């Protein structure tokens, strides 16, 4: 059966996450339903990252096996037609080898978290950023973030119910970009690693927000990391500011 890689964009707001749910809308379920309108199923697709409820994606990657050969451009267009009016889009499709696996072939995942500091409620970015009503110290947050880059035991920064076999991960990059606007300052956290633990990004950003607000010192981030205790973590920030922006492979399937 020919295998296809799909690059996917979605607004996570209306969905109970990526993974198929028995009684709730999911991104996986929406795409599998669209595939079923192209070819008789059942269809099961696998993704590089199983995003949680409310988490968005601009560069999710999944793969599917189909019964016949499709022109990748036409496949993407046909799926998009059947996905309407849901906020899900197949940005690109590519024919790949049977050895390609969206999850297990991935060597890098990239996330963005958008944090907006302003007193007034967000309007145009509602559901797409985490808003806090107080100013933040970007340099303090960068200093705190520096403690987390590299290979560490991230027990403190993973969900209590995380099912990963090991809490040890290598965070390859964690950078902070500030965007000054007329109506507030947006802080954009960019994170890159081969893989992440459940709630790792939201735990890190929630903790760094406390540093930016002055409630924590940058060195307390290191102390929390060294504690290897979930109770030492700062607040876990809400999901709506989180985006899966890209997945890396040894060879780009969409090139």
From Swiss-Prot:
Top-tier EC class: isomerase
Keywords for this protein: Isomerase, tRNA processing
Xref: Gene3D superfamilies: Pseudouridine synthase I, catalytic domain, C-terminal subdomain, Pseudouridine synthase I, catalytic domain, N-terminal subdomain
InterPro entries listed in its UniProt record: PsdUridine_synth_cat_dom_sf (IPR020103), PsdUridine_synth_TruA (IPR001406), PsdUridine_synth_TruA_a/b_dom (IPR020097), PsdUridine_synth_TruA_C (IPR020095), TruA/RsuA/RluB/E/F_N (IPR020094)
Coiled-coil ranges per UniProt: none
Chain sites annotated for binding substrate: 111
Active-site residues (renumbered): 52 (nucleophile)
GO biological process, one term: tRNA pseudouridine synthesis
CDD domains on file: PseudoU_synth_EcTruA
Keyword Isomerase: yes
EC number: 5.4.99.12
Catalyses which reaction(s): uridine(38/39/40) in tRNA = pseudouridine(38/39/40) in tRNA
Domain of life: Bacteria
Pfam families for this protein: PseudoU_synth_1
Any GO MF annotation of the entry: tRNA pseudouridine(38-40) synthase activity
Keyword set includes tRNA processing: yes
Chain's role: Formation of pseudouridine at positions 38, 39 and 40 in the anticodon stem and loop of transfer RNAs.
Alphabetical list of PANTHER family matching this protein: PSEUDOURIDYLATE SYNTHASE, TRNA PSEUDOURIDINE SYNTHASE-LIKE 1
Oligomeric and partner information: Homodimer.
Family: Belongs to the tRNA pseudouridine synthase TruA family.
NCBIfam families: hisT_truA
Protein name, entry field: tRNA pseudouridine synthase A
Organism: Cereibacter sphaeroides (strain KD131 / KCTC 12085)
Lineage of source species: Bacteria, Pseudomonadati, Pseudomonadota, Alphaproteobacteria, Rhodobacterales
């Amino acid at each position: 059966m020919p295998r296809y890689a799909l690059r996917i964009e979605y607004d996570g707001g209306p969905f109970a996450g990526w993974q198929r749910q028995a009684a709730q809308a999911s991104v996986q379920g929406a795409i599998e339903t669209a595939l079923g309108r192209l070819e008789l199923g059942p269809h099961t697709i696998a993704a590089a990252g199983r995003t949680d409820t409310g988490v968005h994606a601009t560069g999710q990657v999944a793969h599917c096996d189909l019964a016949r050969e499709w022109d990748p451009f036409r496949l993407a267009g046909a799926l998009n037609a059947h996905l309407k009016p849901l906020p899900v889009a197949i940005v690109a499709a590519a024919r790949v080898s049977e050895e390609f696996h969206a999850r297990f072939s991935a060597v890098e995942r990239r996330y963005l978290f958008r944090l907006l500091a302003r007193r007034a409620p967000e309007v145009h970015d509602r559901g797409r950023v985490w808003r806090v009503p107080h100013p933040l110290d970007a340099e303090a947050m960068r200093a705190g973030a520096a403690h987390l880059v590299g290979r560490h035991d991230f027990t403190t920064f993973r969900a209590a119910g995380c099912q990963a076999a090991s809490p040890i991960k290598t965070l390859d990059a964690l950078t902070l970009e500030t965007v000054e606007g007329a109506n507030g300052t947006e802080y954009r956290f960019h994170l890159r690693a081969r893989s992440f633990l459940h709630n790792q990004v939201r735990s890190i950003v929630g903790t760094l927000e406390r540093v930016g607000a002055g409630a924590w010192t940058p060195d307390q981030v290191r102390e929390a990391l060294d504690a290897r205790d979930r109770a030492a973590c700062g607040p876990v920030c809400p999901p709506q500011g989180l985006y899966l922006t890209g997945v890396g492979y040894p060879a780009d399937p969409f090139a």
